[in-house]
UniProtKB/Swiss-Prot annotation:
Coiled-coil region(s): 795-852
Domain of life where this protein originates: Eukaryota
Transmembrane segments: 280-300
One GO location term (cellular component): mitochondrial inner membrane
Native source organism of the sequence: Candida albicans (strain SC5314 / ATCC MYA-2876)
One Pfam assignment: RNA12
Entry protein name: Mitochondrial escape protein 2
Compartmental location: Mitochondrion inner membrane
Gene: PRP13
PANTHER family: MITOCHONDRIAL ESCAPE PROTEIN 2 (PTHR32198:SF2)
GO annotation terms (biological process): mitochondrial genome maintenance; mRNA processing
The UniProt record lists the keyword Nucleotide-binding: no
Family of the protein in this entry: Belongs to the YME2 family.
Entry-linked InterPro entries: Mt_escape_2_C, RBD_domain_sf, Yme2_C, Yme2_RRM
Gene Ontology molecular-function annotations: RNA binding
Length: 867
């Protein structure tokens, strides 16, 4: 009974029975249109937003006649505003015909007088003209029945449409428009929440429910004095309600409804909790950014690392093996061969007729191809000749790699001994199986980086790590500082350079592993293809990946770590050598790659021992070339046949390649051999004076601070003989058997002053590090002024050591006297003091002799050591 009363109250009254004081929303719009459109010819709904309706016309709303349904998806809402490429079949005329087909059959006099599509809302307003003798309610009910019947027939036409209907139920529906619709194209996208504003008396919650329930399920109604909110279960129902009821006049013209969509602001409890607490939000944001970086950029960087490894040694000779190059090059070579053959034939015929010879012209033309007195072909031949002595070592290196058993190889040798050329050109470059997957890392460049960004860029360049964003380090530091000021704790956004470098090497490990996995996959596919053509009893067994890598060493990349040292040139980068050693040992232990270390620093072997304990390294020691090879090399480059003038000059250079090349350049620049060698010896002597004998020299980070007197003693001993026994050297008061002495000698070896030779791991002999330094030692000692300076300093250092010893003995003697009754110890200490005092007297006499000496120094001895 109550519902009937509400329905009777909400029934739209006919305008003819409205008393004059009552106000109609539609009448107001008509008046506004007449007043504003006096000069306009276009009064359609698209121009005014209002649909005019006359007698015998009904206005209906068809929902869901477009393919895109409006939903809570924001992207789909925006797409509904545009004409998509595949929506050309849904133009206005075709949609109008679709609506007519859905509504048919109708009376013959019925027709569509106006069609207003709403692309955004996926519906359309359709104005029908119906016969006068047919009631409007009956006409509308007939259209609804026809739409339902026609759509049901279409759904049942095949199983696909039926299944689609069961899942989505996107069947068009027809609603009668009760109000005055406002057709707008504002950016007010459909929403299941409607705002109902009352112009006049408000409606109760029950009245709103009766009015809106026919369009769909309602979740909630929030009534108000001037505005009410209705929450529909679906957006489709809200769209239909908004278009059919807005502008509706109720209660005898006392109430007019204005309806609009209201965007629903949904709040997630978890998101709100995180966003409202900075201590939680910032770490979560950082984690999301890190995840994004890993998912997006790490695969790209991994690909670039793979590309660098696979194409690092790509030469023109390898490029010529490409079949595409052969397709182009072979025809070109054939045509040029025909041309040159024709030219040679014509030239030979001319020579037979004229009797002339082109030998002199050929000689002159060949001379034009010589660069600095040497042709390119000669350079190649001479280089091969120079490396004949190391041929066996090169074969040994290749054999170790092909054996594929603990391929952790160390190539040792002094600076300038050609370690890099030996490995890359003569060992790996000469074998087609080994030169296809090579990664070369210049460790010295990593150690020389002065700033964090420079270090990261250098490491990325060495590994092929791209892209790299160094600017994020600066930004992250500022953000971290600001967050620490706000929250009292660090955000963790900024990473230390150690962590960043470690992550880069970890990604390189993944890239290397992927290369080996790809090689294994190729092997598996090839075996499977062969097995398809074989019988079951003849099929080949597919090896496991570890077995495959063990039997195919060429499938693993070769990592060459050039110029490896135990310490970096910049102290802040000292973490790099152990990091590289651990990374390389991991590659070998996981059977992922072959690793070759090239080092001139013998002390770096300790780091490698720590990184790969319980393993015996395979090492190759490269020494200087022999005298005969050096002589032949220089003579071939300089085109000299008489070696008598060079023998004396080449002897100080030994077989050090860098010094030989420097000697050749000096001679080519116009110096005589004697001038060239004298100048090189003078420069080496100046280097020794400045760097090793200068007490004010600034030492590198981690280097043991040697004493100039220690260097002076070693120089005097090595100037007279080729090697020094370590057991004899430690007899000097300046050296003693201790860890400090070994560190000093190792540091001197690092800077190439000396070379240490070990026997079964124990230091045995000491020799000159660079052959040219031996002549430089003699040059310094032969200079009387320099000799007197350093000899006096050397003797003074010995005197100070003896004086310190006497002072220590005197302190002990004083303590003994207080104890008493230890006459034996007193006599022993007294004799020690007397012996040291006698040494001081002898040293002071030697110092006086040195100061008064005016000629060449004679050979003297101290403690049986010649100097």
């Amino acid at each position: 009974m109550i519902i009937r009363t509400l329905r009777s109250q909400l029934r739209l009254p006919k305008p003819v029975y409205i008393s004059p004081p009552c106000r109609y929303y539609s009448t107001d719009l008509e008046k506004l249109k007449k007043e504003s459109d006096t000069t306009e010819s276009d009064n359609s709904a698209s121009a005014t937003g209002v649909i005019d309706k006359t007698h015998n016309e009904v206005l209906l709303y068809y929902d869901h006649i477009y393919p895109f349904t409006t939903s809570r998806n924001v992207v789909k809402q925006y797409l509904s505003r545009f004409s998509l490429p595949w929506s050309t079949a849904y133009d206005d005329e075709k949609l109008k015909q679709k609506v007519w087909d859905l509504s048919s059959p109708l009376e013959t006099t019925a027709k569509i007088t106006e069609f207003v599509p709403l692309r955004r809302d996926c519906g359309a307003f359709v104005k029908f003209k119906y016969p006068p003798e047919v009631p409007a309610t009956k006409f509308i009910e007939e259209i609804r029945e026809n739409v339902e019947k026609n759509e049901q027939e279409r759904v049942n036409s095949n199983i696909l449409t039926k299944l689609y209907h069961q899942i989505w139920r996107n069947v068009p529906k027809v609603y009668s428009v009760k109000g005055t619709p406002w057709i707008e194209d504002l950016r007010r996208f459909p929403s299941p929440k409607l705002s109902v504003k009352f112009e006049g008396d408000p409606l109760t919650e029950e009245e709103l429910y009766v009015l809106f329930r026919r369009y769909g399920l309602i979740n909630e109604i929030e009534p108000g004095a001037t505005e009410a909110f209705i929450y529909f279960h679906s957006t489709r129902a809200a769209i239909s309600a908004k278009h059919c009821i807005t502008g509706m006049v109720l209660n005898g013209g006392k109430t007019t409804l204005h309806i609009q969509f209201v965007a629903i602001k949904r709040s997630n409890f978890l998101v709100s909790l995180i966003s409202n607490h900075t201590k939680i939000a910032i770490p979560v944001l950082i984690a999301l950014l890190a995840t994004f970086a890993v998912l997006i950029f790490d695969p790209i960087r991994e690909w670039f690392i793979e590309y660098k490894i696979l194409h690092n040694r790509k030469s023109f000779d390898q490029f010529k093996e490409s079949r595409w190059f052969k397709y182009l090059y072979i025809p070109y070579r054939t045509i040029t061969g025909w041309v040159y053959s024709s030219y040679d034939y014509i030239d030979s015929q001319i020579q037979e007729v004229t009797g002339s010879s082109c030998s002199e012209e050929d000689d002159s033309s060949n001379g034009s191809n010589i660069v600095d007195g040497q042709s390119v072909r000669d350079l190649k031949n001479e280089s091969n000749m120079f490396w004949i002595e190391r041929y066996e070592k090169s074969k040994q290196l290749q054999l170790w790699i092909m054996e594929n058993a603990n391929t952790f190889i160390i190539v040792k040798g002094p600076q300038g001994s050609g370690k890099e050329e030996f490995v890359l050109e003569h060992s790996l470059g000469s074998d087609e199986r080994l030169n296809k997957k090579v990664l070369v890392l210049e460790c010295d460049q990593l150690g020389k980086a002065r700033s964090d960004n420079n270090l990261i860029n250098t490491t990325a360049s060495q590994l092929g790590y791209f892209p790299v964003f160094t600017w994020t380090n600066t930004v992250s530091r500022f953000v971290d500082l600001g967050v620490q000021g706000l929250t009292g704790q660090k955000s963790g956004l900024s990473e230390s350079k150690e962590t960043q470098i470690k992550n880069m090497f970890s990604l390189a490990t993944q890239a290397i592993r992927k290369i080996t996995t790809n090689e294994y996959n190729k092997y598996v596919k090839s075996v499977e293809r062969r097995n398809k053509r074989l019988k079951d009893d003849e099929k080949i067994e597919v090896l496991k990946e570890e077995q495959f890598l063990q039997q195919h060493p060429e499938a693993k990349p070769i990592i060459v770590l050039n110029k490896y040292s135990r310490r970096a040139d910049v102290s802040s980068n000292d973490f790099i050598p152990p990091l590289v050693a651990d990374w390389a040992s991991g590659l070998v232990q996981n059977n992922t790659a072959h690793v070759i270390f090239l080092t001139a620093d013998v002390g770096s072997l300790q780091l490698l021992n720590d990184a790969l304990p319980n393993q015996v390294f395979k090492d190759i020691s490269l020494s200087d070339a022999s005298m005969s090879s050096s002589r032949q090399y220089v003579c071939d480059v300089l085109k000299v046949k008489d070696t008598s003038t060079l023998d004396e000059c080449l002897e100080p250079l030994g077989g050090r390649m860098l010094d030989l090349q420097s000697f050749i350049r000096r001679i080519k620049s116009g110096e005589s051999p004697q001038q060239a060698i004298n100048e090189m010896i003078s420069q080496a002597a100046e280097l020794i004076n400045t760097f090793f004998l200068n007490s004010h020299h600034k030492f590198g980070a981690g280097d043991s601070n040697w004493d100039p007197s220690q260097v002076w003693l070693i120089m005097k001993l090595l100037s007279e003989c080729d090697t020094i026994n370590y057991s004899e050297l430690v007899k000097s008061p300046l050296f003693k058997v201790s860890k400090e002495t070994l560190e000093i000698l190792t540091t001197l070896e690092k800077y190439d002053l000396i070379s240490l030779k070990r026997d079964k791991g124990v230091l045995d002999k000491i020799s000159t590090g660079r052959p040219l330094f031996k002549a430089a030692f003699a040059n310094i000692i032969s200079d009387l002024r320099i000799w007197k300076l350093y000899e006096t300093e050397y003797i003074g250092r010995l005197i100070s050591l003896e004086a310190a010893k006497i002072q220590k003995l005197e302190e002990e003697l004083e303590k003994i006297y207080k104890i008493g009754k230890v006459d034996g110890r007193i006599d022993y200490v007294s004799q020690k003091i007397e012996a040291s005092n006698k040494k001081i007297l002898d040293l002071e006499k030697q110092a006086a002799d040195v100061a008064s000496y005016t000629g060449k120094p004679d050979g003297k001895s101290f403690l049986g050591i010649k100097f």
